[in-house]
A protein has these predicted regions:
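Conserved N-terminal beta1-alpha1 strand-loop-helix module at the mouth
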Residues: 1-55, 59-89
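C-terminal helical cap(s) of enzyme catalytic domains, especially alpha/beta-barrels
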Residues: 95-96
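Conserved small/polar residues in nucleotide/adenosyl-binding loops
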Residues: 101-108
Length: 111
């Protein structure tokens, strides 16, 4: 699967790029540039166009903060999410536990 980065902080430019893509041939990556400026709006826009979303935030903090961050992102229509492994084993285990719970709860959703 080809992953296309949407590294725009302007919704119009980001949506124009998305409109040039085919959701059957690629998925889109929303990183910190886009997420910090137009995050939820561009994620929902891309999902509405049929794209799978890769949210590339490289979460890195204490285990409980990463866990709560993932819980906060759980309502978004994302397929993949990155964490930064230098956060350590406990952080990665907390992320995995909450992610697994989220995936099990949404097995029938469009993920």
């Amino acid at each position: 699967m080809i992953i296309v980065a949407i590294d725009e902080n302007n919704f119009k430019k980001a949506s124009e790029l998305i409109n040039k893509l085919d959701p059957k041939k690629c998925m889109v990556k929303i990183g910190s540039v886009a997420f910090n400026s137009i995050g939820h709006e561009i994620i929902y826009y891309a999902a509405d166009q049929g794209f799978k979303i890769f949210l590339d935030l490289k979460l890195h903090d204490i285990p409980n903060t990463v866990k709560k961050s993932i819980q906060g992102l759980a309502s978004l229509p994302i397929k993949m999410l990155t964490i930064h492994t230098s956060g350590g084993k406990d952080m990665m285990m907390a992320a995995m536990a909450v992610s697994y719970t989220h995936l099990r709860a949404h097995e029938t959703d469009r993920y």
